[in-house]
Curated annotation (Swiss-Prot):
Function text: Part of the Sec protein translocase complex. Interacts with the SecYEG preprotein conducting channel. Has a central role in coupling the hydrolysis of ATP to the transfer of proteins into and across the cell membrane, serving both as a receptor for the preprotein-SecB complex and as an ATP-driven molecular motor driving the stepwise translocation of polypeptide chains across the membrane.
HAMAP family, per the entry: SecA
Assembly and interaction partners: Monomer and homodimer. Part of the essential Sec protein translocation apparatus which comprises SecA, SecYEG and auxiliary proteins SecDF-YajC and YidC.
Keywords recorded for this protein, A-Z: ATP-binding, Cell inner membrane, Cell membrane, Cytoplasm, Membrane, Metal-binding, Nucleotide-binding, Protein transport, Translocase, Translocation, Transport, Zinc
Region feature Disordered, mapped onto this chain: 859-901
Any Gene Ontology biological process: protein import
Family under the similarity heading: Belongs to the SecA family.
Ranges that cross the membrane: none
Organism lineage string: Bacteria, Pseudomonadati, Pseudomonadota, Gammaproteobacteria, Enterobacterales
Binding site for ATP: Q87, G105, E106, G107, K108, T109, D512
Co-factor note (free text): May bind 1 zinc ion per subunit.
The protein's name in its UniProt record: Protein translocase subunit SecA
Biased composition (Basic residues): 891-901
Organism: Escherichia coli (strain 55989 / EAEC)
Length: 901
């Protein structure tokens, strides 16, 4: 009560921020007559003037009034569009490291030109981030004339572009691209083998469009660059045949309940749990199929990978539905983004889930991948010196923006008051009744010429509504992930009188729905339109526009509530843009996922008390409130998941930053010999310590062990026992010095053969390759640690603290391994004289010719001795990466001679 009273007196924080900014808007408006007097050349010259002032030490914030006035004037001259006062407010919010909530149709794209221009004056680059390539390209091309008029360069960063083109795009003053592409470029830059391969500059200012979609909805999805792991596609197919034999039960087994089924599904956490009965059946089926031996347990350590396959297959069948979570197109399983309804080409689920879905759908199973580099959007965007974003719906997530990204949310007022009517929700008992009511509503609305937009939460639901409309003889358009290409054209004409459009989640669609349809689209369809044709099209559009307004504007129908209120608000926000008339209503049923999981008991109890008949709906503020509470529950749960993810990823992030900064330092220097020498000392000291403990008696020394270790690990054959016999005065310290000196001498002899420059280049390559290889293995180990760490909670230990502690010791161990492996590889490398190389090459060519001749012989006579010899030659077993190395060192092949291949 007191807070409400204080807010009334002093205004909310949002009001105070806007009040402060309005004073600056007045200054900008006062400058307008002065700017209008400038010639085009003088207006362009302002950019150079601002840059000169910044170089002399003026603060960027001092330039705001003048810079914004310049952009507004340039926009009037180039586009014939003048920034509204609210757009100037939005521009200032975006410059202050804040999130600007601006309603749909308020001109976010034009608003973004203000802070983009201001921050580009520093010369450090501005990244404008969009949700898809189409929007990045569209916004870049639309705004290019304005920025180029003001003397700034514009770049577009698209997937698949060659490195030189990307480098050029990043070198521009303002770069447009998608969140995925910026993140992947960052990871690729940190896997480069020379400074020239890197494309990004230092991350300075990011301006994120649809910021809630990118920083919240996609925050749980890490960006991963992966390489192929071993092939296990056959196992996915074999395990997939077993799953259809299992029966689902409604509840999980407990002390009070024992079900008849084999597994239960927890829809809230999207997990599948096997029951005791299910485990027994699966083990029987695995034995019957010959996958597992009789008497073995699925939980034994030897079957850990098999358990992984069973879990993945069970999740694929029980949790993932075709045309909801993914579509199958051209024999490929493509993920559908649950938040935007778009397909995510090239993205794959990890942990074998994608392969399990491919096996379920009977398409070709692609190899599993191993993570080479990964980062979450949360951590990528926090790398920027300055971050800001804009969206139509941020206020519901203001707390999350503030606590994770340290970004305040400012709600920017609309240019004209909002007059859309948001009608209360209607709740039906069954899905069929709800769909029927939606069809009736559409019939009523279209009969009076009102356009209707129907929002669904999955492709499956959009096709269900589409089929019902077809049966009812209502003409309509469908916009979902399957019909991606016609997207902009369909949305542009969704405001046509009596038009019916069905769309999956509308987030980030980026095209305004203009009442009466888009006259620009009609003009664009003509080849060479005359002025008369354009005037006629505009006049016809005005008639349609007025008719639609008369009918009540665009009507929005939500076929069910989404988990997040924000996405419902995005759907509503398509109507009532720029003060237009409009209306919206959500239709729900007790069979909807959200109602079933979170709100069923209270609402169905209410419905029973009211004695509802089939086809009747309940419409009451209490119901709407109960649903809003259910959504709040889901939102807070999702927030907790994202926060947890971030807390764990922060540990990996500190390590990632350390590795990447080390790697960049390595890339930028040409001579790493000093580092190599320092590492060599550490490695030899630790190696000798293991066999000659410091300050110990000679009886405690293990000289044969040391000699063998030096030979195996560093290819150093030293007669240490002989030295000690012949030189009694040789003590521990001088012995250590001699071993190190010998290793340096052998290394220097190699350097003399190939030359210093070649050796420096080789050293750098070995360090980079070893670092990348160990980092890749460390990432996999961190993944395994992360998956099982929650079990420490049962031992009364804090899983987060345990994760931090263990991952730190793993990181320290990795850095030690790095030293050993670098020195080991450099010590074992065989250096040849040029004439020796020539001789070996000659031998290799002769051997190749001999094999080719033998192959010809084997074609002529399969039973010949030559064919047998060839078979023996080619049938030699290939050593697996994880097998013991044939050299007898006791190490895995990949960590010994396999590394040198």
């Amino acid at each position: 009560m007191l807070i409400k009273l204080l807010t009334k007196v002093f205004g909310s924080r949002n009001d105070r921020t806007l009040r402060r900014m309005r004073k600056v808007v007045n200054i900008i408006n006062a400058m307008e007559p002065e700017m209008e007097k400038l010639s085009d050349e003088e207006l362009k010259g302002k950019t150079a003037e601002f840059r000169a002032r910044l170089e002399k030490g003026e603060v960027l914030e001092n330039l705001i009034p003048e810079a914004f006035a310049v952009v507004r004037e340039a926009s009037k001259r180039v586009f014939g569009m003048r920034h509204f006062d609210v757009q100037l407010l939005g521009g200032m919010v975006l410059n202050e490291r804040c999130i600007a909530e601006m309603r749909t149709g308020e001109g976010k794209t034009l608003t973004a030109t203000l802070p983009a221009y201001l921050n580009a004056l520093t010369g450090k680059g501005v990244h404008v981030v969009t949700v898809n390539d189409y929007l990045a390209q569209r916004d870049a091309e639309n705004n290019r004339p304005l920025f180029e008029f003001l003397g700034l360069t514009v770049g577009i960063n698209l997937p698949g572009m060659p490195a030189p083109a990307k480098r050029e795009a990043y070198a521009a003053d303002i770069t447009y691209g998608t969140n995925n592409e910026y993140g992947f470029d960052y990871l690729r830059d940190n896997m480069a083998f020379s400074p020239e391969e890197r494309v990004q500059r230092k991350l300075h200012y990011a301006l994120v469009d649809e910021v809630d979609s990118i920083l919240i909805d996609e925050a749980r999805t890490p960006l991963i660059i992966s390489g192929p792991a071993e092939d296990s596609s056959e196992m996915y197919k074999r395990v997939n045949k077993i799953i259809p034999h299992l029966i689902r039960q409604e509840k999980e087994d407990s002390e009070t309940f024992q079900g008849e089924g084999h597994f239960s599904v927890d829809e809230k956490s999207r997990q599948v749990n096997l029951t005791e009965r299910g485990l027994v059946l699966i083990e029987e089926l695995l034995v019957k199929e010959g996958i597992m031996d009789e008497g073995e347990s699925l939980y034994s350590p030897a079957n850990i990978m098999l358990m992984h396959h069973v879990t993945a297959a069970l999740r694929a069948h029980a949790l993932f539905t075709r045309d909801v979570d993914y579509i199958v197109k051209d024999g490929e399983v493509i993920i559908v983004d649950e938040h935007t309804g778009r397909t995510m080409q090239g993205r794959r689920w990890s942990d074998g889930l994608h392969q399990a879905v491919e096996a379920k759908e009977g398409v070709q199973i692609q190899n599993e991948n191993q993570t080479l580099a990964s980062i979450t959007f949360q951590n990528y965007f926090r790398l920027y010196e300055k971050l800001a974003g804009m969206t139509g719906t941020a206020d519901t997530e203001a707390f999350e923006f503030s606590s994770i990204y340290k970004l305040d949310t400012v709600v920017v007022p609309t240019n004209r008051p909002m007059i859309r009517k948001d009608l209360p929700d209607l709740v039906y008992m069954t899905e069929a009744e709800k769909i029927q009511a939606i069809i009736e509503d559409i019939k009523e609305r279209t009969a009076k010429g009102q356009p209707v937009l129907v929002g669904t939460i999955s492709i499956e639901k959009s096709e269900l509504v589409s089929n019902e409309l077809t049966k009812a003889g209502i003409k309509h358009n469908v916009l979902n992930a399957k019909f991606h290409a016609n997207e902009a054209a369909i949305v542009a004409q969704a405001g046509y009188p009596a038009a019916v459009t069905i769309a999956t989640n509308m987030a980030g669609r980026g095209t305004d729905i203009v009442l009466g349809g888009s006259w620009q689209a009609e003009v664009a369809a003509l080849e060479n339109p005359t002025a008369e044709q354009i005037e006629k099209i505009k006049a016809d559009w005005q008639v349609r526009h007025d008719a639609v307004l008369e009918a009540g504007g665009l009507h929005i129908i939500g076929t069910e509530r989404h988990e997040s209120r924000r996405i419902d608000n995005q759907l509503r926000g398509r109507s009532g843009r720029q003060g237009d008339a409009g209306s919206s209503r959500f239709y729900l049923s007790m069979e909807d996922a959200l109602m079933r999981i979170f709100a069923s008991d209270r609402v169905s109890g209410m419905m029973r008390k009211l004695g509802m008949k089939p086809g009747e709906a309940i419409e009451h503020p209490w119901v709407t409130k109960a649903i809003a509470n259910a959504q709040r529950k889901v939102e807070s749960r999702n927030f907790d998941i994202r926060k947890q993810l971030l807390e764990y990823d922060d540990v990996a992030n500190d390590q990632r930053r350390a590795i990447y900064s080390q790697r960049n330092e390595l890339l930028d220097v040409s001579d790493v010999s000093e580092t190599i020498n320092s590492i060599r000392e550490d490695v030899f000291k630790a190696t000798i310590d293991a066999y000659i403990p410091p300050q110990s008696l000679e009886e405690m020394w293990d000289i044969p062990g040391l000699q063998e270790r030096l030979k195996n690990d560093f290819d150093l054959d030293l007669p240490i026992a002989e030295w000690l016999d012949k030189e009694p005065e040789l003590h521990e310290e001088t012995l250590r010095e001699r071993i190190l000196a010998q290793s340096i001498e052998v290394y220097q002899r190699k350097e003399e053969v190939v030359g210093a420059e070649m050796m420096r280049h080789f050293e750098k390559g070995v360090m980079l390759q070893t670092l990348d290889s160990l980092w890749k293995e460390h990432l996999a180990a961190m993944d395994y640690l992360r998956q099982g760490i929650h079990l420490r909670g049962y031992a009364q230990k804090d899983p987060k603290q345990e994760y931090k502690r263990e991952s730190f010791s793993m990181f320290a161990a990795m850095l030690e391994s790095l030293k050993y492996e670098v020195i080991g590889t450099l010590s074992k490398v065989q250096v040849r004289m040029p004439e020796e190389v020539e001789e070996l090459e000659q031998q290799r060519r002769m051997e190749a010719e001999r094999l080719a001749q033998m192959q010809q012989l084997s074609h002529q006579d399969d039973d010949s001795a030559a064919a047998a010899a060839l078979a023996a030659q080619t049938g030699e077993r290939k050593v697996g990466r994880n097998d013991p190395c044939p050299c007898g060192s006791g190490k895995k092949y990949k960590q010994c001679h396999g590394r040198l291949q």
